[in-house]
From Swiss-Prot:
GO molecular function: imidazolonepropionase activity; iron ion binding; zinc ion binding
Gene Ontology CC: cytoplasm
PANTHER family membership: IMIDAZOLONEPROPIONASE (PTHR42752), IMIDAZOLONEPROPIONASE-RELATED (PTHR42752:SF1)
The family this protein is said to belong to: Belongs to the metallo-dependent hydrolases superfamily. HutI family.
Stored Gene3D superfamilies: Metal-dependent hydrolases, Urease, subunit C, domain 1
A biological process term (GO) from this entry: L-histidine catabolic process to glutamate and formamide
HAMAP family per the UniProt record, alphabetical: HutI (MF_00372)
Major site of localization recorded for this protein: cytoplasm
Protein's name according to its UniProt entry: Imidazolonepropionase
Cofactor requirement: Zn(2+); Fe(3+)
UniProt-annotated binding residues for N-formimidoyl-L-glutamate: Y145, N320, G322
Annotated source species: Shewanella oneidensis (strain ATCC 700550 / JCM 31522 / CIP 106686 / LMG 19005 / NCIMB 14063 / MR-1)
Catalytic activity: 4-imidazolone-5-propanoate + H2O = N-formimidoyl-L-glutamate
Length: 408
């Protein structure tokens, strides 16, 4: 057989739902890669003969291979920090109180408006490197810290450049509707007009976004405004998604389902009607345990209802300067299990196959199947559950991206 590389002495958590074993596991397995894709996958005993002297053969020493991790919700490109707000919250101030007083998102907006693209790129590169070392091979990056045309474009350009200069694939999301900027205080409808009539066309002209997002919440944008932005995005051929039901239930999830959104994110206050709507539309539920933890929230997402209705559950870091400034995707496995009571298998699916669904790329990545992109990680673990069970010593040994060994 003519392959580019072969991996043997491994166990594989394929996350392929057509395999009935937990994690879609194949033990004592082998993987062959050709032209950046998985060319063969199965038990080592069934691997066709090949010339071991002509291609690289990697021995996994009994470790586990999983699909490359996918972080489907980050705000990775930003300047400044909000450590002072961290102190205020610990003294009793709420996230909403800080935002209404001009802190929160707006303080980061001011820092991003002042930063140039080179500075933002370097900050983003360092953060992307940190995620890559944890086995992340695809990441979504949102804008939303500009809130004017120039800075929103600047953030999205930086995100696109990161994808061009890093082995991690970057999917970009335009989140101009993240908050109402100070210059539009008391005129949120006017700002929505700006998003639709000026910002979005500029984003589309430069091909800077794969999707459009809106923060649908009392402190941000109402249902009517949210629908206006997302409808304009859909009309332009972009995917849509939504921050919703984080602080209250405004019915954003039902709106997202009606619009065919790829995902609804946060959803702590999601009710059964919203869950049913997501199930019927095939919209993913993105769980963000890091923000739940960091903000010391008490309202948990309706995990049992999501299971009951078969809604794909995604885990993501929500890495951002305000509600989760901890740059770790791997930590979400443990948090998803301990805080939201996911099983380790559900948690891993949330960072692989279901995360790919949330980004609309499940035909290429998210599970290990012949013909899909060869994005995978070798972990120094005895069982896949160990990824969720333990944290602190990074067990990621090797990372393959598009068939190339990029981290060893």
């Amino acid at each position: 057989m003519s392959w580019d590389q072969v991996w043997i002495d491994v166990n594989v958590a394929t996350m392929d739902p057509s395999i009935s074993a937990p994690y879609g596991a194949i033990t004592h397995a082998a993987i062959a890669v050709k032209d950046g894709k998985i060319a063969w996958l199965g038990p080592r005993s069934e691997l066709p003969a090949f010339d071991v002297l002509s291609i690289p053969v990697y021995r996994g020493k009994g470790g586990w291979i999983t699909p490359g991790l996918i972080d489907a919700h980050t705000h990775l490109v930003f300047a400044g920090n909000r450590a002072n707000e961290f102190e205020l919250r610990l003294k009793g101030a709420t996230y909403e109180e800080i935002a209404r007083a001009g802190g929160g998102i707006i303080s980061t907006v001011n820092a991003c408006r002042e930063a140039d693209e080179a500075a933002l790129f370097e900050l983003g590169r360092q953060r992307l490197n940190a995620l890559a070392k944890e086995g992340v091979t695809t990441v979504e990056i949102k804008s939303g810290y500009g809130l004017d045309t120039e800075t929103e474009l600047k953030i999205l350009r930086v995100a696109r450049e990161l994808g061009k200069h890093h082995h991690v694939d970057v999917k970009t999301t335009f989140l101009g509707a993240h908050a109402v900027p100070p210059e539009y205080k008391g005129n949120s409808d006017g700002y929505v007009d700006l998003i639709i009539n000026k910002m979005l066309p500029a984003v589309i002209k430069e091909n800077l976004a794969d999707a459009v997002d809106v923060f649908c919440e009392n402190i941000a944008f109402n249902l009517e405004q949210t629908e206006r932005v997302l409808s304009a995005a859909k009309a332009a051929g972009l995917q849509v998604k939504l921050h919703a039901e984080q602080l209250s239930n405004m019915g954003g999830s039902e709106l997202a389902a009606r619009l065919g959104a790829k995902s609804v994110d946060h959803i702590e206050y999601l009710d059964e009607a919203g869950v049913k709507a997501l199930s019927e539309s095939g919209t993913c539920a993105v769980l963000l345990p890091g923000a739940f933890y960091f903000l010391r929230e008490t309202q948990k997402p309706p995990i049992d209802l999501l299971r009951q209705y078969g809604v794909p559950m995604v885990l993501a870091s929500d890495f951002n300067p305000g509600s989760f400034p901890i740059c770790s995707t791997l930590l979400m496995l443990n948090m998803g299990c301990t805080l939201f009571r996911l099983t380790p298998e559900e948690a891993l699916a949330g960072l692989t196959l279901n995360a790919a669904k949330a980004l609309g790329i499940e035909d290429k990545v998210g599970s290990l199947v012949v013909g899909k992109q060869a994005d995978f990680c070798l972990w120094n673990i005895a069982t896949p559950a160990q990824l969720a069970y333990s944290y602190g010593v990074n067990p990621c040994k090797d990372v393959v991206k598009n068939g190339k060994l990029v981290h060893q």
